[in-house]
From Swiss-Prot:
GO terms for molecular function: 8-oxo-7,8-dihydroguanine DNA N-glycosylase activity; class I DNA-(apurinic or apyrimidinic site) endonuclease activity; damaged DNA binding; zinc ion binding. The gene is mutM. Binds 1 zinc ion per subunit. The keyword Zinc applies. Keywords: DNA damage, DNA repair, DNA-binding, Glycosidase, Hydrolase, Lyase, Metal-binding, Multifunctional enzyme, Zinc, Zinc-finger. Belongs to the FPG family. InterPro entries: DNA_glyclase/AP_lyase_DNA-bd (IPR015886), Formamido-pyr_DNA_Glyclase (IPR020629), FPG_cat (IPR012319), MutM-like_N-ter (IPR035937), Ribosomal_uS13-like_H2TH (IPR010979), Znf_DNA_glyclase/AP_lyase (IPR000214), Znf_FPG/IleRS (IPR010663). Its cofactor is Zn(2+). This is Formamidopyrimidine-DNA glycosylase.
């Protein structure tokens, strides 16, 4: 599933084509994805100007001129790609329609935005912009890890007394929004913290050190266009490249990359997910 860096990469790729442009026509080719689409979605989107394209956790939010916000979740295999060349901004001609092109936005600037999702775990919804934060998928989210509300004192307080492994705690979207398996594994490696360690038993200084490390890992991943392991593509169809910088994720049995450590990367299962770490230098 795309994590924060992948969703932010897609948002940045869509913004030049969508922000300030009008949805001249919305094409909805099925009644649902993971959940049913909102009533009259195509009609409600047609003629709306995209005032702002933003991200909250793993969701893309398009604030529309009519006072509604379109929520988009990529799910497991969803892709949003831009085609067309209205002002020399977009490098691809419109491709032929594909089997799993479920929603298409035809913008008044000539761009076309296609949502393709073979596994159909993605989602779209419409809500009033004024109360968007109260949407059931958004109201439960913790602070953004790249935002000002995610700081050392906050994380120390959030993890205090928790008996769950720190890996599971950091994946809790109510504690911090947008973190996923890949980037938690990578951040814990850089911090030298074992994913098995109980969150509430980690010294405050080590918890505090996690905050800038998490920010750094996410920022590097965004700069690299995210990580492409199976399905993820950027908005222009290109792969992400951060997978080439993984220290532990997907490297089971390979040598630890930390200078001076002769350990090997191990894989364990936590809450049904694979955790990758070096037991020798992550304590």
């Amino acid at each position: 599933m795309p994590e924060l860096p992948e969703v932010e990469t897609v948002r940045r790729g869509l913004a030049p084509a969508m922000e300030g442009a009008v949805i001249a026509r919305a094409e909805v080719n099925r009644p649902d994805l993971r959940w049913p689409f909102p009533d009259r979605m195509a009609e409600r989107l047609t003629g709306q100007r995209v005032e702002r394209l933003r991200r909250r956790s793993k969701y893309i939010l398009a604030d529309l001129s009519g006072g509604e916000t379109l929520l988009i979740h990529l799910g497991m295999s969803g892709r949003m790609t831009v085609s067309g060349d209205p002002l020399g901004q977009f490098v691809h001609d419109h491709p032929a329609a594909q089997k799993h092109d479920h929603v298409v936005f035809h913008m008044d600037n000539g761009a076309r935005i296609t949502f393709n999702d073979p596994r159909r775990f993605g989602a779209m919804d419409l809500m009033a912009t004024a109360t968007a934060d109260e949407h059931k998928l958004l109201m439960v989210l913790g602070p953004e890890p790249l935002g000002n509300d995610f700081h050392e004192d906050y994380l120390v307080a959030a993890l205090k007394g928790r008996n769950t492994p720190v890996k599971s705690a950091l994946l809790d979207q109510g504690i911090v929004a947008g973190l996923g398996n890949i980037y938690v594994c990578e951040a814990l490696f850089r911090a030298g913290v074992s994913p098995r360690r109980k969150a509430g038993q980690i010294a405050a200084a080590r918890v505090s050190a996690l905050v800038p490390i998490i920010r750094q890992v996410l920022s590097e991943a965004i700069e690299a266009g995210g990580s492409s392991l199976k399905d993820f593509r950027q908005a222009d169809g290109e792969l992400g490249y951060f997978q080439h910088s993984f220290d532990v994720y997907g490297r089971e049995g390979e040598p630890c990359r930390r200078a001076g450590c002769d350990g090997t990367v191990q894989r364990i299962t936590q809450s049904g997910r694979s955790s990758f770490y070096c037991a020798q230098c992550q304590r």
